[in-house]
Regions:
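Classical eukaryotic N-terminal signal peptides for Sec-dependent ER targeting/secretion
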Residues: 1-22
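Residue-level marker for the onset of beta-strands and adjacent loop->beta junctions
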Residues: 4-5, 98, 106, 146, ...
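N-terminal signal peptide
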Residues: 23-47
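Extracellular leucine-rich repeat
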Residues: 39, 49-83, 87-97, 101-105, ...
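Glycine-centric low-complexity/flexibility signal
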Residues: 53-56, 60, 64-86, 131-279, ...
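Small-residue (G/S/T/A) turn/hinge positions that recur once per unit in extracellular repeat modules
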Residues: 87, 93-95, 100-102, 108-109, ...
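Leucine-rich solenoid repeat scaffolds
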Residues: 163, 291, 301-331
Length: 331
């Protein structure tokens, strides 16, 4: 993966912000993977103008669709942990999940010790937790899966902790998949269109696109996977996978780590997958983490995904950086 350049956002305002809503629309792809854009304050108007342009009707108040079902998990059995999910479950060593993933619920807390990873490296594999207590990721702790949905009183990602759904998307929505047609190695689409290096007769490069934009109706509660990049071969699939989905819901989120839903890279024979979806909802959020739902690189870049951050109040300490590749980052 290419170089990541974190960009600090302006310092938080020195007062309580009322229901600060940051909607990040990840823009159209060019030859490069498309970058994410965080909109704040005045820039928010611009974001909404895009919606108007697309004849968009506002969604009902955020209703949280249930994550895909997965079998109920136990602390010792599924997570190799110590304790139980109705009091406190501590996972001391890394675990590789089998099957479709895990659904974790209980009245207790969950803690991944420093450096521990919970991995389910299959497209669309679910790691879902809904706990009354806390969820804590120690330093360098990781969760890797296609759909990661965590709800708890507090969620804490320690330094260098990572939630990574890169290229692990399950199936995109039915009607408009965003997956490019043909064998031109085009990029997948989602928040933006994928790029294409193939120019149709009578069209210019600027008019040539890969996969389509989709999922306009869930801008505030994005829940779509990114789509796959195209291939240059009918026999072999060289396209990068789409980015997955990450949802985090808590009263307080401490984000010192990284949340990633990037599309996969397609290499020289396939298009990049498009970015997936990230939705964070909290009363307060602090820390200095990174959030990324970029399209993957490839013969043609994948479109960006969607990021929605719905935070009532940002702690004085909260700062966030964006990490997409491409020259756009230097803007
Ligand atoms: C969890 O807490 C709720 C509400 O306090 C209670 O009704 C439920 O029985 C508890 N569940 C367990 C497994 O302790
Ligand atoms: C978590 O579980 C509670 C109680 O079962 C439920 O009310 C709530 O909607 C769940 N939250 C999410 C995000 O699924
Ligand atoms: C969540 O965090 C708050 C503020 O740091 C703390 O007061 C509270 O006890 C935490 N909740 C739990 C369940 O640990
Ligand atoms: C998060 O980062 C802040 C600032 O560096 C630090 O004060 C805090 O202890 C960190 N928290 C965790 C859980 O790593």
């Amino acid at each position: 993966m290419a170089h990541h350049i974190p960009l600090p956002l302006p310092l938080p305002l020195r007062r309580r912000l009322h229901h600060l809503f940051i909607l990040a629309l990840l823009a159209v792809a060019s030859g490069n993977p498309s970058p994410g854009v965080y909109d704040r304050g005045a820039e928010e108007a611009e974001a909404y103008s895009i919606l108007t342009f697309h004849d968009y009707t506002p969604p009902p108040p955020p209703a949280l669709p249930p994550p895909p079902a997965a079998p109920a998990a136990t602390c010792a059995g599924d997570l190799g942990g110590v304790g139980d999910l109705d009091t406190r479950c501590v996972v001391p060593v890394s675990v590789r999940l089998e099957g479709g993933g895990v659904f974790i619920s209980g009245n207790g807390s969950l803690q991944l010790l420093d450096g521990v990873s919970v991995t389910c490296q299959r497209p669309g594999c679910v790691v879902s937790a809904n706990l009354s207590g806390d969820i804590r990721f120690g330093h360098g702790a990781r969760v890797v899966a296609g759909w990661v949905s965590l709800a708890a009183t507090n969620i804490t990602l320690g330094d260098d902790a990572v939630i990574d759904t890169t290229a692990l998307a399950g199936n995109p929505p039915d009607k408009t998949s965003g997956v490019p047609t043909g064998i031109y190695g085009d990029g997948g689409g989602h928040g933006g269109r994928g790029a294409s290096c193939y120019v149709n007769k009578g069209q210019t490069q600027e008019d040539s696109w890969g996969g389509d934009t989709y999922a306009w109706s869930e801008l505030k509660t994005p829940n779509s996977y990114g789509s796959k990049g195209g291939s240059t071969s009918v026999e072999k699939d060289y396209g990068g996978g789409g980015g997955g989905v990450v949802w985090l819901f808590a009263d307080e989120i401490v984000m010192n780590g990284t949340v990633i839903a990037n599309g996969g890279n397609g290499g020289t024979k396939g298009g990049g997958g498009s970015g997936g979806s990230i939705y964070l909802k909290a009363a307060t959020m602090q820390g200095g983490g990174k959030i990324s739902a970029c399209g993957g690189n490839g013969l043609s870049g994948g479109g960006g995904g969607r990021v929605s951050i719905d935070v009532f109040s940002r702690g004085e300490e909260f700062r966030m950086s964006r990490q997409c590749r491409s020259s756009w980052d230097t803007l």
